[in-house]
Curated annotation (Swiss-Prot):
Keyword Cell inner membrane among UniProt keywords: yes
UniProt-listed Enzyme Commission number(s): 3.6.5.n1
Gene Ontology annotations for the cellular component aspect, listed alphabetically: plasma membrane
UniProt name for this protein: Elongation factor 4
GO biological process, one term: positive regulation of translation
Matches recorded under SMART domains: EFG_C (SM00838)
Catalytic activity: GTP + H2O = GDP + phosphate + H(+)
Keyword match Hydrolase: yes
Lineage, highest ranks first: Bacteria, Pseudomonadati, Pseudomonadota, Gammaproteobacteria, Oceanospirillales
Annotated source species: Chromohalobacter salexigens (strain ATCC BAA-138 / DSM 3043 / CIP 106854 / NCIMB 13768 / 1H11)
Enzyme superclass (EC): hydrolase
Coiled-coil region(s): none
Function of the protein: Required for accurate and efficient protein synthesis under certain stress conditions. May act as a fidelity factor of the translation reaction, by catalyzing a one-codon backward translocation of tRNAs on improperly translocated ribosomes. Back-translocation proceeds from a post-translocation (POST) complex to a pre-translocation (PRE) complex, thus giving elongation factor G a second chance to translocate the tRNAs correctly. Binds to ribosomes in a GTP-dependent manner.
Superkingdom: Bacteria
Residues noted as binding GTP in the record, renumbered to the chain: 23-28, 140-143
Gene name, Swiss-Prot/TrEMBL: lepA
Length: 606
């Protein structure tokens, strides 16, 4: 049976994705589905097939959306084409999820039958329901002794509000219940709507850059067909290209020569310009595509956290820029602009979704593009109301205008929803209070409690997620959205080394935290700056006021060692000479600040 006949019917296509929290077994479940449908041979089936980046494997998290097309022979004798789009589960990557969901008609909500529901799955599940997807609850890890499916099914109903009485109970690890799950999938997820005869309309779900092929785009066709050799046009750039390769992922790339309405696959059109196929764009045919509407893609995500990134050697600047461009293609939420710093030279101010995203981007740049990078402390965007009535936005502390010209500073506030087991509620509440949070709501849901807080974003992005995990033994989960800008008493904390301001070490902090923060910072820097031949003074200042100071003592050579007894004036002469030399050195001497010192600012836990 040729592929053409087999895929002639829309009713036999099922597009779905998996929603799950970190560690609830999403990647194992997808491995198992691929194995059952024979997408890979036993030999090729390594753990977490879809996590293709080394980094994803090491950290055990999914970062990028991936897709697989599988053929499943159901009990009714029909062969169904399952298009499965993998989604990440970490809070920093929620935009990836909304993108993947847009291309599907159904979603499997995977919940760990031992742990219960987590905040991130709740957020993603709401997104799925809003987009009109059919959500099937799946209780995973049924082979574990601590699995308690009835309690968890009850939690799913209470917290998310979807019927979980007949949820699929599976163990992806042992393969228990997997066949039944696929049958449910085929039965309950609606087939895609679309007309293969209509003009082409396709959505770019993801793009990445290949050095040989140019831009490869993962697309979902809503109407029409796309064949090798077709002339296509991107709606946003209005540029036309000729299709070089069309096909599906099985997870490997496999050319098929044609994609029809309702299918998910890849398109390569020899686009060498990185901005040629932006994610979320609509593809139409070059001829007659003018009347086709643009698909309501997904809103461009605004970065929440900014940090300066600088190549360690200034010769790498061009390579760094190329690397950022290629990465930004694959990661629609990266935002960057050139920046230069007195201490670190030329680099970029890069915007991220959160600190995990920042670490991952830095690691990908260093691994995939062999760059050595310095990263400054992450900051959020502040809104400044100036005295002349204009409003400015600042994400870089060293670019803050003079305090005398600022009427008021406003910091971004987020609304955070935290799900936590009852035993740890006290810890979480006191952590939120410490971070200047205001409690809005507290709901008891089965054995878990949902806390709703308003917190300053600067407190959340630094290390809140890690702290939350550690005070709740890993059970608490967090999901947050930007609410508004709110006036706050904010000040800029500068670090002076030997009287020179180091712009890369400046941070914006709340006035109440300025003294302890300044002290901690100075102490930390003292440990990290190597001793010089002269005293190095480290000061933390607010405006003109020094709030903390410490000195790295000079190394000293014993110049009087060669005098055996004798006249004291001779010794004094040598000591005076040494003193004068040190003084001269201090005026011209430059203090090298090691990379660790910049990182110390990132890891400052009050």
């Amino acid at each position: 049976m040729s592929r053409d006949e087999k895929n002639a019917t829309l009713p036999h296509i099922r597009n779905f994705s998996i929603i799950a929290h970190i560690d609830h077994g999403k990647s194992t479940l997808s491995d198992r589905i691929i194995q059952i449908c024979g997408g890979l041979t036993e030999r090729e089936l390594k753990e977490q097939v879809l996590d293709s980046m080394d980094l994803e494997r090491e950290r055990g998290i999914t970062i990028k959306a991936q897709s697989v097309t599988l053929d499943y022979k159901a009990e009714d004798g029909q062969v169904y084409q399952l298009n499965f789009i993998d989604t990440p589960g970490h809070v920093d990557f929620s935009y990836e999820v909304s993108r993947s969901l847009y291309a599907c008609e159904g979603a499997l909500l995977v919940v760990d039958a031992g742990q219960g529901v987590e905040a991130q799955s709740v957020a993603n599940c709401y997104t799925a329901v809003e987009q009109g997807l059919e959500v099937l609850p799946v209780l995973n890890k049924m082979d574990l002794p601590q699995a308690d499916p009835d309690r968890v099914a009850h939690e799913v109903e209470e917290i998310i509000g979807i019927d979980a009485s007949d949820a699929c109970r599976v163990s992806a690890k042992s393969g228990l219940g997997m066949e039944a799950l696929l049958e449910r999938l085929v039965r309950d997820v609606p087939p895609p709507k679309g007309d293969p005869e209509a003009p082409l309309q396709a959505l770019i779900v993801d793009s990445w850059f290949d050095n040989y092929l140019g831009v490869i785009s993962l697309v979902r066709l809503f109407d029409g067909t796309i064949k090798k050799g077709d002339k296509i046009r991107m709606k946003s750039t209005e540029r036309a290209w000729e299709v070089g390769e069309v096909g599906i992922f099985t997870p490997k790339r496999k050319e098929t020569g044609i994609l029809r309405a309702g299918e998910v696959g890849f398109v390569v059109a020899g686009i060498k310009d990185i901005h040629g196929a932006p994610v979320g764009d609509t593809i139409v045919h070059a001829k007659g595509g003018e009347d086709v509407a643009r698909l309501p893609g997904f809103q461009k995500v605004k970065p929440q956290v900014y940090a300066g990134m600088f190549p360690v050697s200034s010769d790498d600047y061009e390579d760094f820029r190329d690397a950022l461009e290629k990465l930004a293609l694959n990661d629609a939420s990266l935002d960057y602009e050139p920046e230069n710093s007195d201490a670190l030279g030329f680099g970029f101010r890069v915007g991220f979704l959160g600190t995990l995203h920042m670490e991952i981007v830095q690691e990908r740049l260093e691994r995939e593009y062999n760059l050595d990078l310095l990263t400054t402390a992450p900051t959020v965007i502040y809104e400044l109301a100036m005295k002349d009535g204009e409003t400015r936005y600042v994400s870089n502390p060293s670019k803050l205008p003079d305090m005398a010209d600022i009427e008021e500073m406003r910091e971004p506030v987020v609304r955070a929803s935290i799900l936590v087991p009852q035993d740890f509620v006290g810890n979480v509440i006191s952590e939120c209070e410490q971070r200047r949070g205001t409690q809005l709501d507290m709901l008891f849901l089965g054995s878990q409690i949902q806390l709703t807080y308003e917190l300053p974003m600067s407190e959340v992005v630094m290390d809140f997620f890690d702290r939350l995990k550690s005070i709740s033994r890993g059970y608490a989960s967090l999901e947050y959205n930007f609410e508004r800008f709110e006036a706050a008493k904010l000040v800029r904390l500068d670090v002076l080394i030997n009287g020179d301001r180091v712009d890369a070490l400046a941070t914006i902090v709340h006035r109440d935290h300025a003294h302890p923060r300044g002290r901690a910072l100075v102490e930390k820097m003292k440990e990290l700056i190597p001793r010089q031949m002269f005293d190095v003074a480290i000061q933390a200042t607010l405006g003109g006021q020094v709030v903390a100071r410490s000195t790295v003592k000079a190394l000293r050579k014993n110049v009087t060692a060669k005098c055996y007894g004798g006249d004291v004036t001779r010794k004094r002469k040598l000591l005076e000479k040494q003193k004068a030399g040190k003084k001269r050195m201090k005026q011209v001497g430059k203090v090298e600040i090691p990379q660790d010192a910049f990182l110390a600012v990132l890891k400052m836990n009050d």
